[in-house]
Amino acid sequence: GIAQSFPSTPQILADLGVLLKNPDVELKAVAQQLKRDPALTARLIRLANSAALAQAEPVASVETAVNLAGFQEVHRLVGVAVLDQFGEGGLVAYGIPSRRLRENALFSALLIEQLAKPAGEDPATAYTIGLLRSIGKLGLDRLARTHAPDARFSHEVGGGGVAEWERNVFGMTNGEAAKTIMNSWRFPGETVKAIGEHYAPAGRHLPLTHLLNLAANIAEKIGYGLPGETCYWLETEEVYRKAGVNLRDAKPFIDRAHVVFDRLLRSTF
């Protein structure tokens, strides 16, 4: 039941991700997916008419909006819409305001999207993984409202990480909750696995798990971290090696993520 309380947008994000893996994907197919969510459609058309993309003639159709923004940007923006739908009131049990949740998800997503390129991984898949990194926390926070309304994560208590607190309060961690939620949305196995296991990538073979650990670590270092996670970020050569990223070459990709982050944060979307 933990997944049923969410809107349909993540399903659209999952299906879009699959579509965009095909370089010959048709505009019509992408527009068809977006039309499943009227609120999303309205936001895209509004975006296409914003100052950044404005044309002489106002845009009235999803097809034109997608054409103007481009597939990659549309995929990113659907992700931002997912964040906005879910994180509206922040995560009360975790003490995370909605703005910080949005910044962390977006920055982690853009970092892993950029780092996926030198690692030879699919950037759209990586972006989705970064974006939905905290989806388990969202599910558990919703659960807390009915099952543990007084539960509050405090970073000081015992000095442990957030997953230990989750196990004590909910009987499961946000990684386990994420697997349940994302499996019910029919996300690809590697996406589910990467998010579910990114707190403990040691010994895992999936590069995306290591990439996500790395991206979340960098996001925290730059000032967009979430409470109680520092202890899960690995500062080892193995993480970079298994992620397929050369530490020396990573800086331009991190800078690029920063540029897109600033743009999307300012976006009227």
Task: For every predicted segment, state its role.
Residues 217, 237-269:
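Terminal helices and disordered tails flanking the catalytic cores of nucleotide-processing hydrolases
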